[in-house]
Design a protein with these regions (language model features):
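Short, flexible, solvent-exposed loop/turn segments with mixed acidic/basic and small polar residues
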Residues: 115-116, 140, 326-334, 390-395
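N-terminal glycine-rich, Lys/His-bearing helix-loop that initiates the first secondary-structure elements
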Residues: 1-67, 429-435
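Active-site C-terminal subdomain of aminotransferase-like
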Residues: 31, 48, 53-54, 59-72, ...
Length: 435
């Protein structure tokens, strides 16, 4: 029977992830020659014998060590499912991870991972801003479990981070949680500096884990494991799913860490369902094509926005001339600026709302990474649970608009953006006349 290694190599040469998304981890002979794996829509699996069932449960609950030639069998879809196992094998290829787990949502991946790796008395040092749901979980849910969250700005220097760690008076630093690029400001965090900090202050007995939400650029344009991360997280709803038709999440790490995360997933029941897993496998086949096309269009649109008279500022990863430190991180960590753009429209919330309400081709909706372009207002939508003073500290402004660029023709997107700007300009002109 061919192994995963056999699937991934030809003539001793490693195949690239985009070439393996159609076949890795699956053999058509398993399913009547079907070129695509079927959806294993089942809750439970039949054992060949009571002895086999006992052996599977011993491994599932860690009652004994797995034998050298022993495989974990199928028990129940809350533990494992063939649709999810094939998906998870394929997910590992993009980041070069040993193992992966799929989840019911991005927040399921984040919450399960953090609860698996943290305990009462621990401290999480986290970048700010992060996605609003992550921010709420860090600051409002984890404290209920005796876990403290301490934020830091992505522009903090290694010296400032070291001072912040030294200032932790109660609890033990157990994790550095990073979202980079940050949502919605596109600020970058130096993963290598965070990894060095974790090594400096952690021990073999009490390691400090570096956990990275890689949703904005991954898994094609940034690979955190190569820069010292221990765990990589995704909202698979976004670029991995890519069609705005599913909700899912993913975590990738070493086998020992994934064993802990998967155990927590089993008992929390946060796994992805087989149908969603199958849809994600479909999406992975076009992942690189979609992300590259969207990034090409985003670069054109970001440059156009920067020159627009009604735009005060753009937040895009090739517009970092004002901050050499951010440019340096971009050069070391990122393979592309991606397709997420934020910009400040001149004015405030009223102008931002007029602009958003005037869009026609670009849809007014939260989420990102789909084939269609989306626009939203972070201050009152995705990050509305963060107080206004905290938003200001994080760089989230009332006039900020976040764009997720899809695969439409960029000329048509700019046509839509321009008519929305004109709608704002016409209202402002009328207001001046009335004044």
């Amino acid at each position: 029977m061919p192994t995963l290694h056999d699937h991934a190599h030809i003539g001793g040469q490693q195949l690239r992830p985009e070439s393996l998304m159609m076949s890795y981890g699956y053999t058509p002979a398993w399913s009547e020659g079907a070129i695509k794996p079927p959806i294993f829509q089942t809750s439970t699996f039949v054992f060949d014998s009571a002895e086999q069932g006992k052996a599977y449960f011993e491994l599932a609950y860690g009652l004994r060590q797995q034998g050298p030639d022993e495989e974990m069998g199928l028990i129940y879809s809350r533990l494992n499912n063939p649709s999810l196992e094939i998906l998870e094998h394929r997910l590992t290829l993009w980041d070069g991870a040993e193992d992966a787990a799929s989840f019911a949502s991005g927040m399921a991946a984040i919450s399960t991972t953090l609860l698996a790796l943290l305990k009462p008395g621990d401290v999480v040092l986290h970048s700010e801003p992060v996605y609003g749901g992550s921010d709420f979980f860090l600051k409002n849910v984890l404290p209920k479990f005796g876990i403290t969250a301490v934020g830091f700005r992505p522009t903090a220097t290694p010296e400032e981070l070291t001072a912040q760690v030294a200032g932790i008076e109660q609890g033990r630093l157990a994790m550095i949680f990073v979202e980079t690029p940050a949502n919605p400001t596109n600020h970058l965090v130096d993963l290598e500096a965070c990894a060095a900090l974790a090594r400096q202050h952690g021990t073999s007995e009490h390691p400090i884990r570096l956990v990275v939400d890689n949703t904005f650029l991954g898994p094609v344009f940034q690979h955190p494991l190569k820069h010292g991360a221990d765990v990589v997280l995704y909202s698979a709803t976004k670029f991995l799913g890519g069609h705005s038709d599913l909700i899912a999440g993913a975590a990738l790490a070493s086998k020992p860490l994934m064993k802990e995360i998967k155990a927590m997933r089993t008992f929390m029941g946060t796994m992805c369902d087989p149908n969603t897993g199958w849809m994600l496998m479909r999406s992975l086949e076009t992942l690189k094509l979609r992300m590259e096309r969207a990034a090409q269009s985003a670069q054109i649109i970001a440059d156009w926005l920067r020159a627009h008279p009604l735009v005060q500022r753009t937040y895009y990863l090739t517009h970092l001339e004002h901050c050499p430190a951010q440019q340096d991180i971009y050069r070391r960590h990122c393979l592309s600026p991606g397709s997420m753009i934020s910009f400040d429209i001149k004015g405030g919330e009223p102008e931002a709302f007029r602009f958003l309400n005037a869009l026609r081709l670009i849809k007014l909706a939260v989420s990102l990474g789909g084939t269609e372009s989306l626009a939203e207002h972070p201050a009152t939508m995705t990050h509305s649970d963060i107080s206004v003073p905290e938003q200001a500290e994080m760089g989230i402004t009332a006039q900020m608009i976040r764009l997720s660029i899809g695969v439409e023709d960029p000329r048509d997107l700019m046509l839509d953006l321009e008519q929305a700007f004109e709608a704002v300009g016409m209202v402002k002109a009328r207001e001046l006349e009335l004044a």
